[in-house]
Amino acid sequence: FIAKWDTTQPGSANDTVVLPLVADGSYNFYIDWGDGNRDTITGYNQPEVTHQYSDTGIYTIRVVSNNMVGWQFDDSGDDDKLVEIMEWGPLRFVSDDTNLFKGCSNLTLSTTSNPPFNADAAGMFQDCSSLTGTGGDILNWDVGSVTGMDFMLAGCTSLDADLSNWDVSAVKSAEGFMSGAGLSTMNYDRVLSGWSSQSVQSGVN
C-alpha cells in the first residue's frame, strides 16, 4: 500500500499522521513513513500507529509487508490527510468494515489496480469529493463480487464517470449509491443503459 499524506490537513496535529486501523483487524507489517523512519505494526492501538514528523508537508508512506487487514476512516481521524493512493498493495479489509474511506475529501487515485473490495462496499468512498472519473481506472473496476453498494460513491461531487462497464450482477442493495455525486446527465444515462442490460438480483434497493 503506497499513499501520499499531507500532514497540514485537518485531523491530528499538523506534523502527524494516524493510521485508521481497526480493533478487529490483523496486522504484522513494516511501514516506511517516508522520512527515513520505519516501524513494525502488530496491533491497531500500539503507539507506532501514530507518527510525528520533524517537518510538516506531504509524505509518501509505504507498507512493506503483506499482512495488513483492516482499515476504516468513517468520516473521522486523519481522513482529510490522505491525498493520493498510488498502490493498493497488501491492504485488505475486514469483512464487515464499511465507510472505509468515507470523508477523505482530498483523496485522489493514481493506481490502476483494482481496490480490494469486500462483498459490502457501503459508504466506501462516500464524500470523497476530490475523486474524478479519470483517476484510479475507476471505469474498469471489477465489482463483480460486491453485493452491497449503499452510498458507495455518494457525495463524490467531482466524480463524473461512465460506470456502465461495471458488473453489478451480484448487487443486492444500492441505496443512495451516487446520491449527490457529480454525474452528468450523459453519464447517468450510460450507466442506466449499461446496467439495465445485465442480469441483476431481484428486489435491489
Residues covered by each model-derived region:
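Negatively charged
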Residues: 1-205
